[in-house]
Design a protein with these regions (language model features):
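Two-component system phosphorelay core
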Residues: 1-57, 61-117
Length: 117
């Protein structure tokens, strides 16, 4: 799978990422490094522990990384969750977390396929 094909699969912004990260080669390396990013695991732990500060921090980090890498769907869902958690409430956050998890799982499956090709 090509980098462009990966972005087509996930509904991401290939053009923006390759422009911002200067080259397709560098963008490819950064995208694959996302497999080691711990922000989703931190978010999951914080949500389970009902630790609002850690959940907000992890959601905010995940949002930023996803947006910088052009992971449009994950960036949007993480941004929505971030805004709910910003006001220091879990009200409505569980449904948004499930959307983030779904977007993350889809992205990781596509990313593993890209990394193996």
């Amino acid at each position: 799978m090509t980098l462009n094909g990966f972005y087509n699969t996930i509904g991401g912004d290939y053009g923006d990422v390759t422009k911002r990260l200067v080259s397709e080669e560098f963008a490819s390396r950064m995208v694959v490094k996302f497999l080691k990013d711990g922000s989703f695991a931190a978010l999951s732990s914080a949500m389970a522990a009902r630790n609002i500060d850690e959940a907000f921090r992890a959601a905010h980090t995940l949002k930023g990384v996803a947006q910088n890498l052009g992971f449009t769907n994950l960036g949007k869902s993480a941004a929505e969750l971030t805004e709910v958690l910003r006001v220091r409430t879990f009200s409505g956050s569980d449904e948004l977390y499930e959307k983030v998890k779904s977007d993350y799982d889809f992205l990781i499956a596509a990313l593993k396929e890209f990394a193996e090709s």
